[in-house]
Amino acid sequence: DRLLIADQDRRVGSTLREYSLSGRRYLGRSLPPFKGDAEGVVLWACSAEAGYWIAVDQVRPSEFRVYDRRTLAPAGTFSGRTVADTDGIALQQDASPRFPAGALFAQHDNVAVAAFDLRDIVRALRLDPACAR
């Protein structure tokens, strides 16, 4: 029963804000402010209860922030070699020939799309290995 929305209002700090899907509005909880603009946010569901939220900080290079699905505790950050000023991200959890465990796609500088193998993210941040299956 959680929805995270990327809020870019710098007057109060660009960050993720927590809302409820059960009809209540803003729950009064915000994550720490981002350096740039809080951009796309996706839920990486590893099971019915476990997983991670991934959001992107629109800086150069883009910084991808990973949070525990249940607690919202930071699980780590990562960047790509050629990914900057990301406006949006999309998560594909289905297997494909190129990405057997799925991929995170990120818009790069309004000109291209970058892809991150979910297995690489799991390894780099020491996340739950069940998320890479």
For each predicted feature, which ranges?
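Conserved blade-ending motifs and adjacent loop-strand segments that build the rim/top face
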Residues: 28-42, 71-96
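Residue-level signature of beta-propeller blades and closely related beta-rich strand-turn architectures
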Residues: 9-10, 58-59, 95, 108-110
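Residue position within the beta-strands of beta-propeller blades
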Residues: 5-6, 55-56, 104-106
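Beta-strand initiation motifs
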Residues: 22-29, 49-51, 70-76, 121-132
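Structural motif
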Residues: 11-18, 61-67, 111-124
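Loop/turn-rich, solvent-exposed surfaces of beta-rich toroidal or solenoidal domains
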Residues: 32-74
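Structural signature of eukaryotic scaffold interfaces centered on beta-propeller domains
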Residues: 1, 42-49, 90-102
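Beta-rich catalytic cores
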Residues: 12, 37, 60, 85, ...
